[in-house]
Design a protein with these regions (language model features):
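A nucleotide- and high-energy phosphate-metabolite-utilizing enzyme signature
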Residues: 1-208
Length: 208
């Protein structure tokens, strides 16, 4: 056992980040159930449960969480990515007696994804007999507090192409998929990777 607390910090940081990721995974499962059953405010649809199942959501760790350097007083910085689940090709899909697989529009993805994020946040941070697990902070997302809580990969790409500032590219250095859809998280990581390294050629990148 290491006797020096300072030497232990990298290991502790990794374990805390992994614990936060597991908590977010659990909170997302709770959120999916709540939203599907109509327990939260907002979305109302005849096929509500099916709509929730038709949405992929990935949680991207940022800052200390993304870098696996979390400490006991850190916020858990995240951004959220959504996408419609691609309906599986089945022989009977859409035939008489079989309902067609639900394919969500981008607006529907945004609506349902936002509901899921609100429910997830309540599960982790809401008042309860036990203290909140973590302060989950999504303010590193594009446009900060003024921006939408969830975006598609394509929406993130357009933002980073057109409007992102140098510090936002620097923040992406620590971005890491930590919960939710692993496939969607990997797609987000592949999409933003070029921006991280190409941004070094931008004017005043080092000074910022």
């Amino acid at each position: 056992c290491c006797e020096d607390p300072v030497e232990m910090m990298p290991t502790i940081g990794r374990h805390l980040a992994d614990l936060a990721a597991a908590a977010l995974e659990g909170a997302l499962a709770i959120a999916r159930t709540e939203v599907a059953e109509g327990l939260g405010p907002g979305l109302a649809a005849p096929r509500r449960g099916e709509a929730v199942d038709a949405l992929d959501l990935a949680i991207i760790g940022m800052g200390k969480c993304g870098a696996r350097e979390l400490n006991y007083i850190s916020d858990v910085d995240v951004v959220y990515v959504v996408a419609p689940v691609e309906p599986a090709a089945t022989p009977n899909a859409g035939t008489e007696g079989e309902s067609a697989p639900l394919k969500l529009t981008e607006n529907e993805c945004s609506t349902i994804g936002t509901e899921l994020v609100h429910a997830l946040t309540r599960a982790i941070m809401g008042p309860a007999p036990e203290p909140a697990l973590w302060e989950v902070d999504a303010n590193l997302r594009p446009e900060g507090k003024d921006g939408p809580l969830v975006r598609t990969v394509e929406s993130y790409v357009q933002y980073y192409k057109r409007w992102a500032e140098n510090w936002e590219f620097q923040a992406l250095l620590k971005a890491r998929p930590i919960a939710g859809s692993a496939q969607l998280g990997a797609r987000y990581a592949r999409a933003i990777d070029p921006f991280v390294w190409e941004s070094a050629a931008r004017e005043s990148f080092v000074e910022s």
